[in-house]
Structure formats: structure tokens, C-alpha cells
Amino acid sequence: MPFHNPFIKDGQIKFPDGSSIVAHVERWAKVRGDKLAYRFLDFSTERDGVPRDLTWAQFSARNRAVAARLQQVTQPGDRVAILCPQNLDYLVAFFGALYAGRIAVPLFDPSEPGHVGRLHAVLDNCHPSAILTTTEAAEGVRKFFRTRPANQRPRVIAVDAVPDDVASTWVNPDEPDETTIAYLQYTSGSTRIPTGVQITHLNLATNVVQVIEALEGEEGDRGLSWLPFFHDMGLITALLAPMIGHYFTFMTPAAFVRRPERWIRELARKEGDTGGTISVAPNFAFDHAAARGVPKPGSPPLDLSNVKAVLNGSEPISAATVRRFNEAFGPFGFPPKAIKPSYGLAEATLFVSTTPSAEEPKIITVDRDQLNSGRIVEVDADSPKAVAQASAGKVGIAEWAVIVDAESATELPDGQVGEIWISGQNMGTGYWGKPEESVATFQNILKSRTNPSHAEGATDDATWVRTGDYGAFYDGDLYITGRVKDLVIIDGRNHYPQDLEYSAQEASKAIRTGYVAAFSVPANQLPDEVFENAHSGIKRDPDDTSEQLVIVAERAPGAHKLDIGPITDDIRAAIAVRHGVTVRDVLLTAAGAIPRTSSGKIGRRACRAAYLDGSLRAGKVANDFPDATD
């Protein structure tokens, strides 16, 4: 039956006193206590996975027990860091902190490869009073903290070791007001020191309602994810369940990467299903699943006709990716309209916009030169200057997005590219411990609006979040054109990195699809190898600070034995023809060398840093999502 959303009135989202995600879990524990709430598919011991389940009543009891223990050893307002492996205990730890009236900090087990530096940086910022982990991971966590000063070693609690009967001492904390922080969502950026977005209980509840409304959620819809819970997209997807009241299934990122068919099979219709399946995936996952997740002949039947939505909230999805995924899974009933290009960011809790539920992904082709000059001008797909742009759909209810000339803080008309500013009660309240950055990002005032305006409905004194993303409205839809900080400027001309990267990967089959990074570096910082290469067309000049284009690309499987000369020549030629710019260095690397964020995005700034310090050329592997098999 259709999900009746009692919190939406006259285009606004309003909650009764005492309403929170915690209150919703307690409600389901009373009225659906024996029904499944969360299922973890554990592939660590069985190839086909072992389901590990919690009912709503069990989930409530575990949450109250952990909360009671936290109330014994911490104070209101204390931060509680979650350093659990991705399993049921992680969700109990997160909710336990909320139940206790403490500030949750969703992080990760220190044994996660490549994340130790980030973990230290986050802990230095939030200074937690307690750590929640598991019995199995506790020794590794304590060992990690032994590397820190004695006064920075918080109490470590294994959530699975807290007895259920401790729940009897739980004290329901004071009702949160609109400023009460629920958790800190640390951004997934690759190079800068992580910043913790302060997400209030009101922000969280609002954004969950916005997602459900945008997807036309129904009772009986179930959620599915393999994304890490320390990432906003993974966390919010898991939190849809307490609002709808149906169950959520998850696995680890490694389980998906190693065998993407696991995710595909969980998307499929299950016995007893009364609704659809809602999932999320970054852009690379669609190609990965299409390449390696299609059932082999003789496999059990697969019915994907029930898939309601798979949100893609990372970099814009390409027409080729959509085509490959639909060709791979259309024969199994996958609905083309289920792929939902979306837009979101931690500063908005997560969700800003998505493709309407009844629509297929909308991908238009625009003139490259016009786009680089700040305008959306549609052209035929076969135009030599055509570049594809995927719509991010419509902005959610009770939130607003405007395209702004950042220098003058004025709204730009449709069709013009500017910085995306957003507003609504799902916006976080700032960055933890960073007041100046908080004001600069979260406390902006829109000085003038167009007529009509995309800010219609927002108050005149509303504050706006600067997203750092370029975008435009066109034909009623929001389009994301790129990150402000990632824009490549060569000889005074703008180039979007994803456009350059697409041209590079299309130039040669020896390049791994989706594993290309484009960025610029000053000429006098290029490595010696560039000046020794006649193809670079540049001579060393210590005073030359002009920005020069660099392409880093991972080799496709089986391409490591090929002569790199023709490959790099093809890339240089393709970019020269399509973009009118010279590539000074094409660096081909082994698989896994290009850094990625926790959501699977190319970490361009981290890649640039590794290029400049020489670690990329030295063969360092930095990928968070290794292309492993088991």
C-alpha cells in the first residue's frame, strides 16, 4: 500500500514533539517486534553467505543495552566513535549512541587498509570519550590507540559483549530540539583534513522523509546496500528502514567487489515480498556489475522486475554505463527507470535531488565549448563537440537548490552554469570544531533572485550552503557539471575533468574504464620524465608556472604487456582533437593505483598529490576498492 507520509504538510516537513529515528525504532519494536529489521549477509565463512538477523524487538533491546552502558561512562554531548567492522554490531553501535543522547561518529575498523591516517585526523578533531567496537576487533582497536598519547585513549566498549539485561537501566534522554546533534558525518574527501558535518536529529529525520517521498516509498519496500556505513550514502540508506518499518539487507563492500552477482541477486524479488527493492551504488558499480555480475547459464532464475530504485549519487552516470547495465540485466526484468541519477552531499545530510520515480535517466548532449564557457546548449549527439550530461533530476520536497554567481551571491537564470547553493532543514549546522569554515560554507545569504526563482518558498533570510559544485538548471532538471576545485584551467580555458577522462578512456581499449584521472600541475613541478619525453612538447623552465594537463590511467586487464607508446599516443591525439589541449604527461599505472573516495569517486586531488610526490610512478597502490577475486 502507498506509504502515507504524515509529516508533509503544505510542502513542508513538520514533526510532532518527541519524533525521532529512535522513537520510530521503539514503535516498530512494540507493534512489529517479531518482524525482521536488519539482515547482514556474512560472506566471510560461506561463499553463498550466511544471513544474520535482528528483529525489531531484538534491535531495540540491543540498542537500549549499549545506550545504558554509554550513559554509565560518558556525559551528554560526548562523542562516541564507532570503529566496528561492517556487520549488525555497527548498526547497534550507531543507534546505541543515539539512544544514549550522545553524538555518534560513524567511522571504521582500524584494520581497513589505507585509512589509518584519516582515522587519526578524525579522532584529533572530534576527541571521542568512548569507542564502540566488537569483541573480535577490540584488540586491534586497542593496539591502534596505543600509538596515541595516553590522554587520548578513550574507553573501548565491545557492543556484542554488553548483556541485554543492562537495557533495564537505560534512561530515555531529553527530547532533542532542532539544534541537538545526532552524529558527525565526516566527509569522504581524499586529501584535505576530514571535516565533520554536524547532523542534528531534525536534519536526519527530514532527509529520510525527503528520500522516501522522492522515491514514492511504500510499506513493504526493502532496502539493500553494500556501501560502508561511515559513508553518508551507506548510512542514510540503512536508516530508511525505521521510517518505513520494513527490513534492510546489507553486505560488506568487499563482498560486492569480489562477486557483484551477490548484490544483483539480493536486488531480486524474494518470497513474501510485498513491495519493491531500493538500493544505492556509485557510478563504477554499474559497470562492475554489468561486467562481472551477470548470472552464468544454468544459474538459478533471477527476477529483477521488482527493483524500484538504485540511486547513483556519486559522479554523473554515463549513457554508456546505463546502456551496458540495461543490456546486462534487462533480460532478467530490470526496469530501465530504476536507475536513478541523483545528487547529494554530506552537508545536506545526504539527499538533494533524484530522477522522478516514473522517469528513466535523462542524458542530454551539449556543446563542449559552450559548457566550458558556462552555458548549457543542446546539440545533436553526433556533433563533434557533443558531450553527454546526465540529469540529477528534481530537488526534494522542502529543500531548495539555486545556481549562483558566487562572487555576487546572485541567482543565475536557467541554462547558465554557476555554483550550486542549497537550503532546507536537512542542512547540517556546520563543521565540528571549525567555526570559520562553518560560516563560510553554511551561512550564506542569497542577495538576489531571478523571476521565477528556484528559491521560491524559501524565506528571504534563509541561509544557504555553498556546495563547491558547478551546475545548471535546464528544462526543469538539475545538472551537475563538476567540482569547483577539480576544474582544469589550461591557457585560460575551462575543462571539466570527467570530460577529459572520458575522452582518454575511449581512445584506447588498453585503458580500464572508469579508472582515469585528469588534473593540472604547474610546468615547473612536472617530473624529469616529462621533459625527457619528446612527445610532451615542453622544455624545462624553472620560472614556468603555467598549468599543464596530466592524464593518469590504469591499464585494463591483460594490457600490461602492450607497448605503451601507441596507447599514450592515442590518448594525446584524442584529447588534442576533442578539447584542443596538449597532454604533457600520460602516466599508465597498474590496477588499483588511482585513489578513490569511500563512495567510489576518483580522488583527483589525492591522485595529483601522489603524482607530484612520485609515489604513483613508483607503483604505489592506493585504491580503496581493489579488484579482488575469491
Curated annotation (Swiss-Prot):
Its EC number is 6.2.1.20. ATP binds at T187, S188, G189, S190, T191, R192, S342, A346, D469, R483. InterPro entries: AMP-bd_C_sf, AMP-dep_synth/lig_dom, ANL_N_sf, FAAL/FAAC, FAAL_FadD32. It catalyses: a long-chain fatty acid + holo-[ACP] + ATP = a long-chain fatty acyl-[ACP] + AMP + diphosphate; decanoate + ATP + H(+) = decanoyl-AMP + diphosphate; dodecanoate + ATP + H(+) = dodecanoyl-AMP + diphosphate; tetradecanoate + ATP + H(+) = tetradecanoyl-AMP + diphosphate. Gene3D superfamilies: 3.30.300.30, N-terminal domain of ligase-like. The acyl-AMP ligase activity is inhibited by the alkylphosphate ester of AMP, adenosine 50-dodecylphosphate (AMPC12). Also inhibited by eicosyl-AMP (AMPC20). Pfam families: AMP-binding. Monomer. Involved in the biosynthesis of mycolic acids. Catalyzes the activation of long-chain fatty acids as acyl-adenylates (acyl-AMP), which are then transferred to the phosphopantetheine arm of the polyketide synthase Pks13 for further chain extension. Can use decanoate (C10), dodecanoate (C12) and tetradecanoate (C14). Consists of two globular domains connected by a flexible linker. ATP binds in a cleft at the interface between the N- and C-terminal domains and its binding induces significant local conformational changes. This is Long-chain-fatty-acid--AMP ligase FadD32. It comes from Mycolicibacterium smegmatis (strain ATCC 700084 / mc(2)155) (Mycobacterium smegmatis). The gene is fadD32.
